[in-house]
Amino acid sequence: MKPRVAVVNSKSFGRFTDAVSRLESRCIVDQIEVPKNVSEKELAEKLVGYHFIVASVTPRYDEEFFKSNADVVMIVRHGIGLDNIDLKAAEKHGVKVVAVPGYREREAVAEHAVALMLSALRRVVEANDSVRKGGWHERAKFVSRNLSSLTVGVVGFGNIGSRVAEILRKGFGSRVIAYDPYVREEKMRALGVVPVGSIVELMAESDIVTLHASLSPETYRIINREALMSARRGIILVNTARGELLDQDALAEALDKGVVSAVALDVVEKEPIGLDYPLLKYGNVVITPHIAAYTREALTAMDETIVEAIFNYLDKKPIEGIVVDPRESRNLVL
């Protein structure tokens, strides 16, 4: 009997590669859609009989799920974020958890962050809309600044944040400062980046702030009202990390007061959004639908990680990207 793989709520896994057919050479593979807020018990019942889960950003996999489903032996995230998986509960119940190593989507996300940065700074979307409405003569209102002349603050200096900083320093010659209490200052300075000691300090010194921190209790709404109201007036905010890093209500207030001059987001707190999403009323807000990692190169690398992880599990080989490896792991029972 073959092991079973559930691809849950992922529309991109295998879309541009032969990942599904490769898995099917050794496993039974099913695409499963569930509501993003499905209950843990209902989710556990839906996935009875599946041994491997290819997980997207939804739904959540918490204690109740692991307690109620004894079949799953490994969850593999089709991405690098793990905030929808209770890692402690997974370990407690003997379930391995794997995430795509950050380097697999580093270039894609970093490039998108810079693209959003330039779009917000140069008001590309607004200018395009103006032309489409016959406003070619309104060019003067889109006079902007050179990115090379500005200070960019990077929040989170890990795999992606450090690459964004490198692009800005070497490609544009921007002054870059960074805040990350978990990274040695020497690593920042080696890239020509100036470390700062707090979010408030970073906000006060930056013309543009780009978010690249992982989501945790410490970083939840790290850009709050205090941080926003301490910002240099006219600051631009870019977020390609997690929507929960930003306090949406405080951001709207900062936009209304002119403290924030433009925003470019690839993520929001509750995805997906509809036409009633509050920030859509602002012409100086650009939002893309969580596509920073959506390049063929990144998706191919992510698919490869997932196939390799499942095959290596079956072959009892080391698994790249493993973040939870319980001492007493569940056994695969066919």
Language-model regions: role of each:
Residues 27, 95, 193-194, 284-286:
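Short, conserved active-site loop motifs that form the nucleotide-linked donor/cofactor pocket
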Residues 48, 61-65, 174, 181-278, ...:
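Rossmann-like adenosine-cofactor binding region
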Residues 165, 169, 256:
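Gly/Ala-rich phosphate-binding loop of Rossmann-like dinucleotide-binding domains
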Residues 2, 91, 99-110, 269-334:
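C-terminal helix-to-coil terminal segments
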Residues 1-52, 186, 314, 330-334:
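N-terminal glycine-/charge-rich "phosphate-binding" loop or analogous flexible N-terminal tail
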